[in-house]
UniProtKB/Swiss-Prot annotation:
Record flagged with keyword Nucleotidyltransferase: no
PANTHER family cross-referenced by the UniProt entry: 39S RIBOSOMAL PROTEIN L28, MITOCHONDRIAL, LARGE RIBOSOMAL SUBUNIT PROTEIN BL28M
One family name in Pfam for this protein: Ribosomal_L28
Transmembrane segments: none
Family note: Belongs to the bacterial ribosomal protein bL28 family.
Keyword Ribonucleoprotein in annotation: yes
Protein's recorded name: Large ribosomal subunit protein bL28
GO cellular component: cytosolic large ribosomal subunit
Annotated SUPFAM superfamilies: L28p-like
Classification lineage: Bacteria, Pseudomonadati, Pseudomonadota, Gammaproteobacteria, Pseudomonadales
One GO MF term attached to the UniProt entry: structural constituent of ribosome
Organism: Stutzerimonas stutzeri (strain A1501) (Pseudomonas stutzeri)
InterPro entries: Ribosomal_bL28 (IPR026569), Ribosomal_bL28/bL31-like_sf (IPR034704), Ribosomal_bL28_bact-type (IPR001383), Ribosomal_bL28_sf (IPR037147)
């Protein structure tokens, strides 16, 4: 399973660990992904999504119905 938010599309990015001696080693910054069940009142069921913390805020702001419509328009099975 990929580490990508279903709502925002955020995925891992790369960067450096930097030591006190300023040595640089490559690392990955992973998104804060959570499996979360959202109640969809219009469908009378729960929908389980893998979303980042920002994705949850987007759903709170815009509503789960709007976000699900966009996911389905993109071709994601929900």
């Amino acid at each position: 399973m990929s580490r990508v938010c279903q709502v925002t599309g955020k995925g891992p990015v790369t960067g450096n660990n930097i030591s006190h001696a300023n040595n640089k080693t490559r690392r990955r910054f992973l998104p804060n992904l959570q499996h979360h069940r959202f109640w969809v009142e219009s469908e009378k069921r729960f929908v389980r999504l893998r979303v980042s913390a920002k994705g949850m805020r987007v759903i709170d702001k815009r509503g789960i119905d709007v976000v699900l419509a966009e996911l389905r328009a993109r071709g994601e099975k929900v």
